[in-house]
């Protein structure tokens, strides 16, 4: 059976413009849908789609800018709405009503004109701001990260000496949880990316897929003392982790292995932060990298300094697929406990000192690097492939139509 899908993209580059883990997942989801039907795409992202894909048709592509930025009065009104109507999705996600009404009109005119079997988008926030909740009976929603868990982890990092901030954060977490359950209880299919953190009892686990992977089965440790971090720098948990690593951990590594260098591959709009990164000795902030495969190939060790956030790390799946030895925090390997073992597939750092010591150990232990590389790559091949992703999407949709 062939299906007709309408895919809405509002934020991330897709089909040829993959510049972060979210872009990769969006693109693979479109490809999975195109594998079982025809996909019409409405793209509101500021980056045009640059790659043709089989069974995909771009029916609308236009970036709608925030021509009227929010005023102080509007911001105050938005904040008040979160407390006056805590379980109303618009209270949490509406930013620019004028822009969102234009987006809603564009989608509505096309969704009603054509008999689409399903309307598809990623993230609850996009479903709300694009006015898609009205299509709940045919809405496929890739939630990806659990919104409730994300707010709880943000709550855990609030200073205990700021009780009002903590109380409002807790209030938001409770509101987001109720709102998430309400939305996912009505829409027809939802997916999430972390096996141990489902946002709703009906949500289906859908594995992340690496954007790049190793093309051979031979792994040789490169003893060049190059460390690599990959990730969208403007994503708050990434920015915090990178900052912490550069300030607290990297200098300790260079005391023992002085020629160690750190390459950071990831886009950012924060030129001041980008400049600060490059001002640190041994640190090379590269910005957006077109060919990530070369960066992975050139690195001796890949690290994931993630201390909070939700979902699962696409960069962890990429590093495993590329057969690279990995040192990560506990948060960086969330959701992989059933397929990965510490010290077998990766090394896990519990403290700053432990992080530095384990990186130094790998930089000076080629045999351990090779063992980790082989084991990690085998796990990625068996559990994190596109085939797994495609199969999960197809089964979920076919089950719905039985």
Q: What is the role of each PLM region?
A:
Residues 148, 168-217:
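Donor nucleotide-sugar binding/catalytic pocket of nucleotide-sugar-dependent glycosyltransferases
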Residues 315-318, 325-330:
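Short hydrophobic beta-strand element within catalytic cores of glycosyltransferases
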Residues 367-398:
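A charged, aromatic-enriched C-terminal amphipathic alpha-helix characteristic of glycosyltransferases
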Residues 1-62:
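N-terminal subdomain of nucleotide-sugar transferases
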Residues 282, 297-311, 322-325:
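Acidic donor-binding loop of glycosyltransferase active sites
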Residues 344-353, 361-367:
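Conserved acidic donor-binding segment of nucleotide-sugar-dependent glycosyltransferases
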Residues 25-28, 205-277, 285-293, 297:
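Conserved catalytic-core segment of nucleotide-activated headgroup transferases in glycan assembly
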Residues 10, 68-94, 141-179, 232:
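Acceptor-binding helix/loop patch of EC 2.4 sugar-transfer enzymes
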């Amino acid at each position: 059976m062939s299906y007709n899908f309408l895919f809405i993209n509002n934020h991330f580059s897709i089909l040829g413009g993959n510049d972060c883990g979210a872009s990769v997942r969006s693109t693979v989801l479109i490809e999975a849908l195109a594998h079982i039907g025809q996909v019409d795409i409405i793209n509101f992202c500021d980056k045009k789609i640059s790659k043709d894909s089989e069974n995909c048709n771009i029916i609308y592509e236009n970036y709608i800018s925030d021509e009227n930025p929010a005023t102080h009065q509007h911001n105050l009104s938005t904040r008040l709405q979160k407390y006056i109507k805590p379980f109303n999705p618009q209270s949490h996600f509406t930013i620019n009503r004028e822009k969102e009404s234009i987006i809603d009109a564009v989608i509505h005119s096309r969704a009603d004109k054509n008999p689409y079997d399903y309307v598809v988008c990623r993230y609850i926030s996009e479903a709300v701001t694009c006015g898609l909740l009205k299509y709940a009976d045919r809405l496929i929603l890739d939630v990806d990260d659990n919104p409730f868990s994300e707010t709880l982890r943000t709550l855990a990092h609030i200073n205990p000496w700021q009780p009002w901030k903590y109380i409002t954060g807790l209030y938001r977490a409770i509101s987001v949880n109720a709102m998430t359950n309400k939305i996912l209880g009505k829409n027809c299919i939802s997916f999430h990316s972390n096996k141990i953190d489902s946002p709703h009892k009906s949500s289906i686990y859908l594995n992340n897929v690496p954007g790049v992977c190793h093309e051979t089965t031979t792994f040789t440790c490169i003893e060049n003392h190059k460390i690599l971090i990959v990730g969208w720098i403007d994503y708050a948990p990434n920015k915090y982790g990178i900052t912490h690593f550069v300030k607290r951990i990297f200098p300790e590594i260079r005391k023992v292995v002085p020629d160690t260098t750190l390459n950071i591959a990831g886009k950012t709009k924060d030129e001041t932060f980008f400049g600060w990164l490059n001002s640190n000795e041994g640190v090379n902030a590269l910005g957006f990298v077109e060919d990530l495969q070369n960066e992975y190939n050139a690195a001796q060790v890949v690290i994931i300094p993630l201390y909070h956030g939700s979902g699962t790390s696409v960069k962890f799946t990429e590093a495993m697929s590329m057969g690279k030895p990995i040192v990560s925090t506990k948060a960086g390997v969330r959701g992989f406990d059933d397929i990965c073992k510490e010290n077998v597939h990766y090394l896990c750092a519990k403290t700053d000192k432990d992080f530095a010591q384990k990186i130094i150990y790998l930089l000076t232990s080629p045999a351990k690097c090779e063992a980790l590389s082989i084991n990690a790559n085998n796990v990625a091949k068996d559990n994190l492939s596109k085939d797994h992703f495609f199969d999960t999407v197809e089964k979920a949709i076919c089950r719905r139509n039985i």
